[in-house]
């Protein structure tokens, strides 16, 4: 929107051509989303509190969590509002990737919103059934996967890139590309949701990974940089850096309210949407393996749940004191802030390793 306006003004005032630079618009998007979140955040939290949109707490969890009961949830609507409004303002709205990512984010956010609404507004403790959630997640993810497969311009746009090796890629073909895309989007969405169990635990890794994906998107969309770094050139993917900038800014602002002791939780509306956004951006810029590296905390959290369930069903024993993994460490005696900050540190290290794959080939 503002890009189109600046291009129109630039016909008379050439200085406005500066807004055509993706790097500038990415920074402005981060600042805009940050500002929007800070402006409307307090009012939204007050509204959620007044409506008694409070979080329920598991009785079988750490006893320290009982004080969290009643804390406003569905704060993910704040993040989504800031991200989408900012994207509409600063991104090139003729770019199809912007719409793919935005609509995917909103779609998964809608699933999470319905789940949260049923749990906290209608007082239905089960919320949206697991099968219903999985069904709608699958529908959206498959639609996105098929669309990306059908619109892939070159064979390398559907290859799996192997990091740390120069020009090593695994041809997937249409079917395997669709399967991989589906797994990445649905898997990342649910992994972020599982991680969102402590104050600030999920949002900061999301911010760090989003910032890294902004760099991957920018270089993938730049023919010269992509060739130099030995990664696939994805025309027009650079515009996704603007979306990532908005997500980074909105996420940092949300952390202001979500840090311990949290004033608001993001709820499924935020966690499912943010995970899906990271997943679909990763697929577009062809960095699925790198996402597994950078999102190691999300991977560990999801695996801990799968291992716990499988072990109990098969052998009647639990591997962890409690799943997801962050609760295991709490029950071992770690304070909540210790778990959160240590997981942040792990994510920072993994993100730096992920970024190093751009050069270490």
From Swiss-Prot:
Listed CDD domains: GT_MraY
Annotated Pfam families: Glycos_transf_4, MraY_sig1
Enzyme Commission number(s): 2.7.8.13
Cofactor: Mg(2+)
Subcellular locations according to the entry: Cell inner membrane
Transmembrane segments: 28-48, 73-93, 97-117, 134-154, 168-188, 200-220, 237-257, 264-284, 289-309, 338-358
Any one of the GO CC terms: plasma membrane
Main location: membrane
UniProt GO molecular function: metal ion binding; phospho-N-acetylmuramoyl-pentapeptide-transferase activity; UDP-N-acetylmuramoyl-L-alanyl-D-glutamyl-meso-2,6-diaminopimelyl-D-alanyl-D-alanine:undecaprenyl-phosphate transferase activity
Pathway the protein acts in: Cell wall biogenesis; peptidoglycan biosynthesis
Presence of keyword Membrane: yes
Highest taxon of the lineage: Bacteria
Gene Ontology biological process: cell division; cell wall organization; peptidoglycan biosynthetic process; regulation of cell shape
UniProt xrefs under InterPro entries: Glycosyl_transferase_4 (IPR000715), PNAcMuramoyl-5peptid_Trfase (IPR003524), PNAcMuramoyl-5peptid_Trfase_CS (IPR018480)
Keywords: Cell cycle, Cell division, Cell inner membrane, Cell membrane, Cell shape, Cell wall biogenesis/degradation, Magnesium, Membrane, Metal-binding, Peptidoglycan synthesis, Transferase, Transmembrane, Transmembrane helix
Keyword Cell cycle annotated: yes
Annotated family: Belongs to the glycosyltransferase 4 family. MraY subfamily.
Function, in words: Catalyzes the initial step of the lipid cycle reactions in the biosynthesis of the cell wall peptidoglycan: transfers peptidoglycan precursor phospho-MurNAc-pentapeptide from UDP-MurNAc-pentapeptide onto the lipid carrier undecaprenyl phosphate, yielding undecaprenyl-pyrophosphoryl-MurNAc-pentapeptide, known as lipid I.
Name of the protein this chain belongs to: Phospho-N-acetylmuramoyl-pentapeptide-transferase
